[in-house]
Amino acid sequence: MRDPVSSQYSSFLFWRMPIPELDLSELEGLGLSDSPTYKSKESNSIGKMGGQATGAERKSPEGDPLLEYSTFNFWRAPIASIRSIDLDLL
């Protein structure tokens, strides 16, 4: 059986850097403080995951200023445009 003291110090959770606290003044500077995107763990019910929201809690896509950066289409490489002249050459 492993020694519980040595296994405590060999775990990833012990040695990883702590997650920094969120500075609300930085959010105010970005204009995001008045619209909370995620709820804290205490406000979620037991059956829900932290990032999920019900239909009534979801914001409209037009109201989310960061939606364009979180979509697949923003981060993928653009599709190369092919002109009809190029197709004729093939």
UniProtKB/Swiss-Prot annotation:
Its main location: nucleus. InterPro entries: MLLT11_fam (IPR026778), WRNPLPNID (IPR033461). The keyword Cytoplasm applies. The modification Phosphoserine is found at S60, S84. GO terms for cellular component: centrosome; cytoplasm; cytosol; nucleoplasm. GO terms for biological process: extrinsic apoptotic signaling pathway; intrinsic apoptotic signaling pathway; positive regulation of apoptotic process; positive regulation of DNA-templated transcription; positive regulation of mitochondrial depolarization; positive regulation of release of cytochrome c from mitochondria. A motif (Nuclear export signal) lies at residues 24-32. Residues 33-63 are annotated as: Disordered. It is found in: Nucleus; Cytoplasm; Cytoplasm, Cytoskeleton, Microtubule organizing center, Centrosome. It holds the Pfam family WRNPLPNID. It comes from the Eukaryota. Keywords: Cytoplasm, Cytoskeleton, Nucleus, Phosphoprotein, Ubl conjugation. Ubiquitinated, leading to degradation. Interacts with HSPA8 and LAMP2 isoform A; the interaction may target MLLT11 for degradation via chaperone-mediated autophagy. Interacts with TCF7. Cofactor for the transcription factor TCF7. Involved in regulation of lymphoid development by driving multipotent hematopoietic progenitor cells towards a T-cell fate. Belongs to the MLLT11 family. PANTHER family: PROTEIN AF1Q. This is Protein AF1q.
